[in-house]
Amino acid sequence: MNPPRITAFHALTHRVRWRIFAFLFAFAFIAYFQQKGLTVAAERIMPDLGISQVQVGWLEWAFVLGYAAFQFPGGVIGQRLGARVTFTLIGIVAFLATVLTPLAPRLLQGSALFLMLFALQLLMGLAQAGIFPVGSGVMEAWFRPEKWAIIQGVQTMGMQFAAAATPPIVALLMSSVGWQKALFWPALPAIVVIALWAWYGRNTPNEHPSVSAAELAELDPRSLQQSPTTISGRRIMQVLANRSILLLTVSYVCMNYVFYLIGNWCFLYLVQERHFNILESGWLAMIPPLAAGLGGGIGGKLVAVLVDRFGIRWGFRLLPMLALPTSGTLILVAVNLNNPYGAVGALALAYAVLELNEGAFWGATMYIARSDTMSATGVLNTGGNIGGLIGIPIVAYLSGGGHWTAAFVIGTVLALLGAVMWMGIDADKSIG
């Protein structure tokens, strides 16, 4: 039986699932604002605290280490505790790590300060690791399969819009109140969102008192019949041994080297290699993530159209096989352009084309894993952040020596390799 037809406006205003998704969007936005602040403030932090660019790279690496290491455990914990409790814990710990970072220099200095900053970045990574795996499990429970790639794309918009907003906001605040307050004050709204989620959020539609019978009828019966909190060692091993999930993970490693290259290093690249000043770099550095946010939203819809037209297997394959090589080519174009503004435009386009693929990666994993989506996307995003673990020290070393072009060439090669992996991925074969 087909779900009842309702208007898009009525769904957005009267359906609880869209309010739940609004929280997921907000979590992604807040998480990326918290993550990117240190990178933008690095140009002021380095001379103020006597920290080198390589050390800044290690601070970013500490976050990615915690973030990568706890992706899969975070997904498993999310399945065990449920999204309501897990997101509340994530929010509290990440908030504390964020606000303690600018306060640490008041108490410590030298090596002790660097170790404290390293520990706080590691803690933030551990805390935030579960956001996207647990969020994907919420999407699996609250939305029909044909919407998964679309809403994953929209969530990508949230995180990229935060990445776009961070450079100008932090740069402007640094110019007026200093880098410490620039990192502290924007963190405070997160507390309100966490409190609202703890009050309103639920793990599944069946648990929410405001979900009507009409809304339940619109949802996927298979998702409603499964409990996301049941997890066993056997099911974990099925996730870890699945060929398509492993290939998705390897491909995501390759893609995320490029993701971190543009997302984390664009600001410093514009300052050091293209010789823009701090404020202008702050404004220009928001262009690539804005473009990437639009790319994420468009990509989710494109995947849905392709799946409807070509079926699940090729519908998910086609976009990454085309978009990843295109993005890799565009970053080479960017670093070889003489016009600095043209380089910004090429980087923005490369990032947008790269982020077209988010809906394909996450949506395919959800199709394969179904009720084990939290664990499976934890595996996927572990791979994605291994790309960052590999890439951050490489880019820090190469950029510190002025060899930015070499860092971008590596990205081109990995983008091509990531596209090849998709030939072996079949999202039409689910686990179990």
Residue ranges and their predicted role:
Residues 155-208:
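Helix-loop-helix hairpin linking two adjacent transmembrane segments in secondary transporters
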Residues 36, 64-72, 129, 163-164, ...:
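Residue-level signature of mid-helix packing/kink "hotspots" within the transmembrane helices
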Residues 19-53, 262-267:
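Extracytoplasmic
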Residues 38-40, 241-297, 358, 362:
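Extracytoplasmic gate region of multi-pass secondary transporters
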Residues 313-360:
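C-terminal transmembrane helical hairpin of 12-TM major facilitator-type secondary transporters
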Residues 92-110, 325-338:
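C-terminal ends and interior cores of transmembrane alpha-helices
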Residues 97, 112-130, 341-356:
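Hydrophobic core of transmembrane alpha-helices in multi-pass small-molecule transporters
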Residues 120-159:
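Cytoplasmic helix-loop-helix junction between adjacent transmembrane helices
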